[in-house]
Design a protein with these regions (language model features):
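Conserved Rossmann-fold NAD(P)-dependent oxidoreductase catalytic core, especially the SDR/UDP-sugar
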Residues: 95-136
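Active-site Tyr-X1-5-Lys
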Residues: 134-158
């Protein structure tokens, strides 16, 4: 018996890769709900053009599909907003989703996507509810998580916080690093390299699939970071990329005045 999976926001970078990953498995029927058309027309997936901020159309679509599983990826993810209202997909869209869930009789599990930017860079949260955003986008994702916690689904559920995910079909801001490398415009600064948690999208969608199809009912372990381990040393990674491109990264020394 096949299972129906809805990817809300399946036309985006992670969503596109997740749909391709799921379609390689048997007994899965995949549906993409997104305001934007899919980047790839994949055999076996079904696209529905829906604005998740419009409750009635979102409700009708999900009710018609009657999914067994949902992965919610839809969001505004850039940092250019001037107010929280600019991130309505991350707030109102999630509120609408939570309103619809009780009407889905076959739903077994939902995974809702947040962001590591619910905490500023370098801040280590003490628990699942410890937030320290430094951007409006991060604040909007705090709202995402709070909406989910305050309207906990009756089925199993989990929240994921992707780190710096890269790979096929990715865009700003993480593509910028690769574009600078290919243009020979990246330089090592000073004598000390930093580390950052990146995640290859192929690994990320595998992690999402594992969370989706495994039990996460422990209320103390509802939030999962998506990314590769261990963290990546930026200098080492830049050197590896430069080697593949056939050149050597130059180092700029700091001048102390």
């Amino acid at each position: 018996m096949s299972h129906r999976i809805v990817i809300v926001g399946g036309s985006g970078f992670i969503g596109t890769n997740l749909i391709l990953f799921l379609l390689r498995q048997k007994d899965l029927e995949v549906f993409n709900i997104d305001i934007n058309p899919p980047r790839l027309r994949s055999k076996g997936s079904h696209y529905h053009s829906i604005d998740i901020c419009h409750l009635s159309s979102f409700y009708s679509c999900l009710l018609e599909i009657s999914p067994d599983y949902i992965v919610h990826l839809a969001a505004r993810t850039d940092l250019g907003g001037n107010s929280l209202d600019d991130y309505s997909a991350n707030t109102l869209g999630v509120e609408n989703l939570m309103k619809i869930l009780p009407s889905l009789p076959n739903l077994k599990k939902i995974v809702i996507t947040s962001s590591m930017l619910v905490c500023r860079t370098g801040y280590y949260p003490k628990n699942q509810f410890d937030y320290a955003p430094s951007t409006l986008y991060g604040e909007s994702k705090v709202k995402t998580e709070e909406i989910v916690w305050h309207n906990s689904p009756q089925c199993d559920w989990a929240i994921i916080r992707p780190t710096s995910i890269w790979g096929p079909w990715f865009g700003v801001p993480y593509r910028n690093f690769f574009d600078m490398m290919m243009a020979h415009r990246y330089f090592h600064i000073g004598c000390k390299g930093c580390t950052k948690t990146y995640g290859y999208v192929g690994n990320a969608v595998y992690q999402i699939e594992q969370i989706l199809f495994n039990d996460t009912r422990d209320e103390n372990q509802k939030v999962f970071y998506i990314g590769d381990n261990p963290p990546t040393n930026i200098e080492d990674w830049a050197n590896e990329i430069a080697d593949e491109l056939g050149y050597k990264v130059q180092r700029l020394s700091l001048i102390h005045i």
